[in-house]
């Protein structure tokens, strides 16, 4: 598997823990404020991005779904409401995020439709050809080994099943890029520190976005791993992108 520059980006540079361990600990630490900060820092735009990503599955109408890096289950809940599959399983390496997600699911009475499990995207504990569709929102950037995670998701997809990835990207227009850079470098870490007491998590957000292979580069990785019918859509002047591929 190819190693990428972003694979080495970690939240806590002085830590001796692996990226996977650091990411799990980071999300455990910010789990209580994660949803609030998502809405606040994106001015609610992230909800629209998630809806557009899930809409890529409208034609497929999947019955059995996997939401990788499910976090607090925003996408799993939204996918159930939009697509009405028989079952959604969400996996994540952060118990703190999963705890928040389970409370949301229970409050909505969806515990019979959505199940959350502690699970590793690079070693998914399901058989080959299990899921009709897989979603992963703002998660692949946190994989310790990007290609390994993408290959694992392909393994558990059924033939004809579809992967939908939603991930941050970098604006191309110079003026927008300047505003974006200022916001990510100056505003986001300060707000993260103020509300979650964890500035490092939001500095990591900026660095991991900058070094992540995006756009045609990411599609090329999907192609290399033999996903079919690959494409991407740029959202909000390039701040976010949707990537899709079929097994």
Where are these regions (language model features)?
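C-terminal alpha-helical "lid/dimerization" subdomain adjacent to the S-adenosyl-L-methionine
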Residues: 166-221, 231
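A short glycine-rich, Lys/Arg-flanked "PGG" loop and its adjoining helix->strand segment in the class I
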Residues: 147-159
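C-terminal lobe and adjacent flexible extensions of AdoMet/dcAdoMet transferase-like proteins
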Residues: 221-247
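Conserved alpha-helix/loop element of class I SAM-dependent methyltransferases that forms part
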Residues: 33-36, 43-63, 78
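Class I SAM-dependent methyltransferase SAM/SAH-binding core
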Residues: 64-123
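Hydrophobic beta-strand segment of the Class I
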Residues: 34, 134-135
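A short acidic, Gly/Pro-enriched loop at the edge of an enzyme's catalytic core
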Residues: 122-133
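N-terminal auxiliary segments of SAM/dcSAM-dependent transferases
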Residues: 1-25
């Amino acid at each position: 598997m190819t190693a990428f520059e972003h694979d080495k980006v970690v939240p806590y540079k002085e830590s001796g823990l692996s990226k996977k361990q650091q990411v799990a600990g980071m999300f455990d630490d910010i789990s209580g404020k994660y949803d609030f900060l998502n809405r606040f820092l994106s001015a609610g735009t992230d909800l629209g991005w998630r809806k557009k990503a899930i809409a890529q599955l409208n034609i497929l109408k999947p019955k059995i779904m996997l939401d990788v890096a499910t976090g607090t289950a925003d996408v799993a809940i939204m996918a159930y409401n939009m697509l009405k599959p028989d079952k959604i399983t969400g996996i994540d390496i952060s118990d703190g995020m999963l705890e928040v997600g389970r409370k949301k699911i229970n409050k909505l009475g969806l515990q019979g439709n959505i199940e959350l499990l502690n699970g590793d995207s690079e070693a998914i504990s399901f058989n080959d050809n299990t899921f009709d569709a897989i979603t992963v929102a703002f998660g692949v950037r946190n994989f310790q080994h990007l290609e390994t995670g993408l290959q694992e998701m392909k393994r558990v997809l059924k033939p004809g099943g579809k992967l939908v990835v939603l991930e941050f990207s970098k604006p191309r227009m110079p003026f927008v890029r300047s505003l974006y850079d200022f916001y990510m470098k100056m505003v986001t870490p300060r707000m993260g520190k103020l509300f979650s007491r964890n500035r490092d998590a939001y500095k990591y957000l900026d660095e991991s976005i900058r070094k992540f292979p995006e756009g045609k580069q990411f599609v090329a990785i999907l192609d290399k791993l033999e996903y079919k019918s690959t494409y991407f859509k740029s959202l909000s002047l390039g701040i976010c992108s949707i990537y899709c591929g079929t097994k």
